[in-house]
């Protein structure tokens, strides 16, 4: 493999699309806390001075959509009208209805194990051994940059920061191995009274240098900090935000393929979300077991049918055993029917708001990041 560059981006919790994702998942969590069997599909739209929460829900729970929305926006940091978006004064519109009974009859079964998929679709899971969390380095460090921006904004280290921010990191590879970081982009919303010089110094010394490993930075690494020179207008004033519009940020930063389905606002019966989590769990355990250095798995489903319609695995020439054997091991060790994978990963509980910013993968607090199957996979592979 020749030398090449690869780039991934991330966005902060204050980015308009991420505000929408977090509100959708906050509503989902509130419902699941009361009714773990609820069916939820919650979509959010944010723009200057308003939030629209819509979707389809079937549940015995009652939740206060307006209060959940305001609390979420407040925690993100939009608390002043001079930002153009204020948790306490924005309009909150509720357009949630009931899920179609046609979907219910396809999903629900007398035997829970035979629960059908909530929709057709294809999902991918991926892992590689570039980082200790078995994730691609570009997306891992792109997330780390905007997460650090949030930390130093909230703890007052850089009091002129505001919630909206974006990062982008370009890694240089040689023969598939990382040899350095070629370029770093970080754009952050800020107060009007900070100078460009102070902003660049603060971001470099307080955000970039503490996050990016020094051994990957060199004299040729390029840094672009607020390259337009000014980022005062941001958040929902600058752009409208929608749930599900940051699916590459949410997953592998473009290094793996994506089936197209978004995650936030969806309960575990929606395989767009739950099967993508299960696919990550499978891929990570295959890499953790040493059966491949890189692994991508695809699963697909038909609405109302429990068994996956297909399972395929690609190891990009790094596999230690055949891909046919890997598929056999996956069928043997992992439950990929909707009810089974929900039980396997304990997904019917309120854990989702935390996923809605800084990536759904590579964060060990989530159950799909466990590597508890690695030893058994390795043994059964004969290694």
Curated annotation (Swiss-Prot):
Keywords: ATP-binding, Cytoplasm, Magnesium, Metal-binding, Nucleotide-binding, One-carbon metabolism, Potassium, Transferase. Gene3D superfamilies: 3.30.300.10. Binds 2 divalent ions per subunit. Binds 1 potassium ion per subunit. Residues 99-109 are annotated as: Flexible loop. The keyword Thylakoid does not apply. It is found in: Cytoplasm. Catalyzes the formation of S-adenosylmethionine (AdoMet) from methionine and ATP. The overall synthetic reaction is composed of two sequential steps, AdoMet formation and the subsequent tripolyphosphate hydrolysis which occurs prior to release of AdoMet from the enzyme. K(+) binds at residue 43. It is an enzyme of class 2 (transferase). Belongs to the AdoMet synthase family. One of its GO terms (biological process) is one-carbon metabolic process. The gene is metK. Mg(2+) binds at residue 17. This is S-adenosylmethionine synthase. Pathway: Amino-acid biosynthesis; S-adenosyl-L-methionine biosynthesis; S-adenosyl-L-methionine from L-methionine: step 1/1. InterPro entries: ADOMET_SYNTHASE_CS, S-AdoMet_synt_C, S-AdoMet_synt_central, S-AdoMet_synt_N, S-AdoMet_synthetase, S-AdoMet_synthetase_sfam. Disulfide bonds: none annotated. Homotetramer; dimer of dimers. Its EC number is 2.5.1.6. ATP binds at residues 15, 164-166, 230-231, 239, 245-246, 262, 266. GO terms for cellular component: cytoplasm.
């Amino acid at each position: 493999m020749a030398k090449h560059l690869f780039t991934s981006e991330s966005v902060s919790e204050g980015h308009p699309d991420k505000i929408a994702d977090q509100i959708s998942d906050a509503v989902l969590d509130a419902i699941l806390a009361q009714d773990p069997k609820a069916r939820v599909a919650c979509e959010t739209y944010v723009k200057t001075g308003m939030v629209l929460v819509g979707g389809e829900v079937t549940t015995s729970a009652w939740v206060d959509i307006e209060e959940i929305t305001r609390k979420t926006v407040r925690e993100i940091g939009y608390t002043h009208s001079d930002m153009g978006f204020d948790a306490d004064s924005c309009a909150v519109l509720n357009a949630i209805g009931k899920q179609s009974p046609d979907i219910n009859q396809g999903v629900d079964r007398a035997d829970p194990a035979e629960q059908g998929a909530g929709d057709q679709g294809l999902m991918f899971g991926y892992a590689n051994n570039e980082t200790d969390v078995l994730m691609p380095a570009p997306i891992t460090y792109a997330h780390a940059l905007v997460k650090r921006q949030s930390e130093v904004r909230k703890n007052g280290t850089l009091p002129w920061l505001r919630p909206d921010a974006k990062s982008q990191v370009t890694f240089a590879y040689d023969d598939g191995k990382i040899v350095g970081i070629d370029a770093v982009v970080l754009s952050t919303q800020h107060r009007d009274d900070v100078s460009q010089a102070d902003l660049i110094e603060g971001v470099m010394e307080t955000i970039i240098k503490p996050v990016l490993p020094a051994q990957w930075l060199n004299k040729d690494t390029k840094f672009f900090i607020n390259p337009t020179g000014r980022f005062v207008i941001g958040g929902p004033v600058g752009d409208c935000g929608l749930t599900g519009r940051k699916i590459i940020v949410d997953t592998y930063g473009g290094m793996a393929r994506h089936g197209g389905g978004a995650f936030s606002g969806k309960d575990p019966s929606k395989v767009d979300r739950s099967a993508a989590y299960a696919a990550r769990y499978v891929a990570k355990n295959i890499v953790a077991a040493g059966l491949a250095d890189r692994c991508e798995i695809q699963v697909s489903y038909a609405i109302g049918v429990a068994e996956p319609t297909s399972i395929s695995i690609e190891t990009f020439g790094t596999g230690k055993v055949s891909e046919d054997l890997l598929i056999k091991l996956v069928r043997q060790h992992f439950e990929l029917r909707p009810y089974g994978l929900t039980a396997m990963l304990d997904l019917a509980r309120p854990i989702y708001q935390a996923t809605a910013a800084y990536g759904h993968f590579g964060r060990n607090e989530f159950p799909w990041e466990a590597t508890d199957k690695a030893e058994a996979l390795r043994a059964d592979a004969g290694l």
